[in-house]
């Protein structure tokens, strides 16, 4: 199974039925599979904090959900986490595709990548980086179970080691021979 198939199956196993997301190249296979699966309701969001708010509201109405976004979009959700999800003990699942590491060309992505984990730590939000297929299902499954058991949010970060990263970003890297034409 691919990483996206494993994530989708693990969400299903844990009765997570809502996927609120902001479109992202890396997450595309996962988002397309969720949209094509009748077990899921997918909701596109204009901003990442909107996706988190959608998941929080759905949980209060009895529906389990996950907010999916890219690292740079994570920078927008601080207020939603600090003023809604954390104080009201909402088990919001965040699935974040990681950019800003391993040869990233975009300085904005690198800055956000360096602040993401410290921000999660400051908010007391458990987070795990998923880096290989061998441990993906176990870590994601236990993270989701812990979130719903403890009524606390969790973030799972999809490393480029797992997803292959963003091909568009890789194409922008400057080789030792100089910029690509």
Predicted regions, residues:
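Thiamine diphosphate
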Residues: 1-181
């Amino acid at each position: 199974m691919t990483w996206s198939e494993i994530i989708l199956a693990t969400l299903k196993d844990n009765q997570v039925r809502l996927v609120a997301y902001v479109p992202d190249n890396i997450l595309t296979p996962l988002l397309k599979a969720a949209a094509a699966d009748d077990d899921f309701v997918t909701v596109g969001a204009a901003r990442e904090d909107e996706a988190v708010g959608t998941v929080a509201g759905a949980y209060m109405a009895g529906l389990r959900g996950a907010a999916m976004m890219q690292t740079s979009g994570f920078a927008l959700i601080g207020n939603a986490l600090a003023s809604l999800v954390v104080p009201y003990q909402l088990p919001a699942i965040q699935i974040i595709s990681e950019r800003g590491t391993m040869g990233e060309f975009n300085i904005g992505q690198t800055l956000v990548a360096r602040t993401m984990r410290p921000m999660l730590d400051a908010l007391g939000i458990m987070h795990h980086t998923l880096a290989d297929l061998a441990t993906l299902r176990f870590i994601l499954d236990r993270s989701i179970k812990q979130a719903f058991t403890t009524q606390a949010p969790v973030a799972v970060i999809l490393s480029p080691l797992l997803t292959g990263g963003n091909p568009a970003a890789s194409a922008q890297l400057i080789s030792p021979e100089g910029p690509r034409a």
